[in-house]
UniProtKB/Swiss-Prot annotation:
Pfam families, per database record: SSB
Keyword tags: DNA damage, DNA recombination, DNA repair, DNA replication, DNA-binding
Xref: NCBIfam families: ssb
BP GO terms, sorted: DNA recombination; DNA repair; DNA replication
Protein's UniProt name: Single-stranded DNA-binding protein 3
InterPro entries linked to this entry: NA-bd_OB-fold, Primosome_PriB/ssb, ssDNA-bd
GO cellular component, one term: nucleoid
Ranges where the SSB domain occurs: 1-104
Function: Plays an important role in DNA replication, recombination and repair. Binds to ssDNA and to an array of partner proteins to recruit them to their sites of action during DNA metabolism.
Single Gene Ontology MF annotation: single-stranded DNA binding
PROSITE patterns tied to this protein: SSB
PANTHER family the UniProt entry points to: SINGLE-STRANDED DNA-BINDING PROTEIN
Compositionally biased spans, kind Low complexity: 105-121
Length: 138
């Protein structure tokens, strides 16, 4: 059986770092991952995927990857369940990240955040071209 996940997305907020009673670091975070197709309005939608990472990798992620950071992770899908205070059974599906990698420098991330995620910083104030996927040769 194979349970491998590879995701590339942006952190929706800073990771929440906590420690277990046995002093093991664990961080939870969410990645916004763009879908490969556009909706009926012509816009790309994103999936927001809950993730968890453990030990030294958790501390590293919490220290270095902040909201908006482009991150690549490898890991596996995990399902678990628990009973909440109202006695209801709650089911959770999340990605357990085993490794992560920052995919852009801190400087480029800060520039992206400061420019309001503008994509025209390299090309001046050029107008955006409207190219549909049907026009592409591949």
């Amino acid at each position: 059986m194979i349970n491998n996940i590879v995701l590339v997305g942006r952190m929706t907020k800073d990771a929440e770092l906590r420690y277990t009673p046995s002093n093991q670091a664990v961080a939870t975070f969410s990645l916004a991952v763009n879908r490969n197709f556009k909706n009926q309005s012509g816009e790309r939608e994103a999936d927001f995927i809950n993730c968890v990472i453990w030990r030294q990798q958790a501390e590293n992620l919490a220290n270095w990857a902040k909201k908006g950071a482009l991150v690549g992770i490898t890991g596996r899908i995990q399902t678990r369940n628990y009973e909440n205070q109202q006695g209801q059974r709650i089911y959770v599906t999340e990605v357990v990240a085993e490794n992560f990698q920052l995919l852009e420098s801190r400087n480029s991330q800060q520039q992206t955040n400061q420019s309001g995620n503008s994509s025209n910083s390299y090309f001046g104030n050029a107008n955006k071209m409207d190219i549909s996927d049907d026009d592409l040769p591949f």
